[in-house]
Regions:
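Conserved small-residue-rich
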Residues: 171-215
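Short, contiguous alpha-helical
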Residues: 33-80, 123-170, 203-251, 280, ...
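Extreme N-terminal tail/first-helix region
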Residues: 1-14, 165-184
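Acidic/histidine-rich alpha-helical segments that form the ligand environment
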Residues: 79-125, 144, 182, 186-195, ...
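Active-site-adjacent scaffolding segments
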Residues: 1, 8, 12, 63-73, ...
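Long, hydrophobic N-terminal alpha-helical segment
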Residues: 19-20, 24-31, 36-41, 190, ...
Length: 337
């Protein structure tokens, strides 16, 4: 008999997959060639990516018996999935839309098959911790809750249809570029956390007496406005009043959250993506003479500009960790106790 949490994860995946298939089926021929904000993939490329590698994925690793806490920890530190993703997309560029649609229809079959034969002997491995970044940790069991991936890319495709986007080539100083990879990795981890949140959890308090999970998302979405102010100050485009305002941290944060009251989760994620792109555009404008600038925090601490870029990514990871208790996996576990 399949494990109840695995059956729930598979049902969630099937529901998310039907949603993604519906979005793909609604595309016109010209929609497939539209670019997806804010990168350089087309909708066709995004569908090719959403298919995945057709493997059993995490469930296959569990069955293979290769997972140990040490293996997971070391792999999470060095493995960067983006190169593999780019390779898969490049290889599938020769496929027709019909080919990709068929592959997408079958894409999760192996994963589901292997997941449903997991049993109680696999419970210790499902409980292994998977470090995702500062203050952000999930479990091996969360790998089985893969519906987030289809939800995320369904929204990406919708965004491409709604926006006229053309890729922008951004280049960074080497000192900045050295931090960008980790910033992007933590952003992907944050999106995983966002699209894993249960629909009925958003309006619940993340902490007793504090913001709801949706308000926390509003803060995360708007927070890039803070580094943008600091970067514009370095570029000579922000005044003292603006830079002083962001140091009144609680007041500034609450004002940004209040401005987004009533926004849908999807609108907040759109805001999140747009704001991050604007931050990257500012980072691309930095020149060697700007590298000597220091960034001051409300605490009085100061960091170098390259270190501050790393801080932007760590903020994403920290808030992703805050969202984990609201995930579909945790909600199911809570209801099952």
């Amino acid at each position: 008999m399949s494990l109840p949490q695995v059956e729930a994860a598979v049902e969630d995946l099937r529901h998310a997959h039907r949603e993604l298939l519906g979005v793909v089926d609604s595309l016109s021929d010209s929609d497939w060639e539209r670019y997806v904000p804010y990168g350089d993939w087309t909708v066709k490329d995004k569908v090719a990516h959403a298919i995945g590698d057709m493997s059993p994925s995490g469930a296959g690793l569990i069955h293979a018996g290769v997972l140990t806490p040490e293996f997971i920890e070391s792999t999470s530190r060095v493995f960067d999935v983006r190169a593999r993703n780019a390779s898969i997309v490049e290889e599938r560029r020769r496929y027709t839309k019909e080919d990709l649609r068929q592959l997408l229809f079958e894409s999760h079959d192996a994963m589901i098959e292997y997941a449903l034969i997991l049993n109680e002997s696999n419970l210790p491995v499902l409980a292994y911790a998977v470090p995702m970044g500062p203050e952000y940790e999930i479990k091996v069991e969360d790998w089985l809750w893969h519906g987030y991936h289809d939800r995320q890319h369904a929204d990406d495709i919708r965004r491409a249809v709604e926006m006229d986007w053309q890729p922008e080539k951004l280049t960074f100083l080497p000192e900045i570029d050295a931090q960008i990879g980790l910033v992007q990795r933590y952003r992907e981890g944050l999106l995983r956390a966002i699209y894993s949140v249960a629909d009925d959890a958003w309006d619940e308090p993340a902490t007793p007496g504090g913001w709801t999970y949706k308000q926390d998302l509003a803060h995360i979405a708007s927070n890039d406005l803070r580094p943008q102010t600091r970067l514009r100050a370095i570029l000579g485009e922000a005044g003292d009043e603006e830079t002083a305002a962001i140091l009144r941290t609680d007041e500034w944060n609450q004002a940004r959250v209040d401005e987004r009251k009533g926004w849908s989760v999807r609108r907040l994620v759109d805001d999140l993506a747009a704001n991050r792109h604007q931050t990257l555009k500012l980072l691309a404008r930095l020149r060697p003479e700007h590298l000597s600038a220091t960034i001051s925090f409300a605490s009085g601490d100061q960091v170098s500009l390259p270190d501050y870029v790393g801080h932007i990514g760590r903020h994403d990871a920290m808030h992703a960790g805050h969202l984990v208790p609201a995930s579909r996996a945790r909600r199911f576990a809570m209801k099952s106790q």
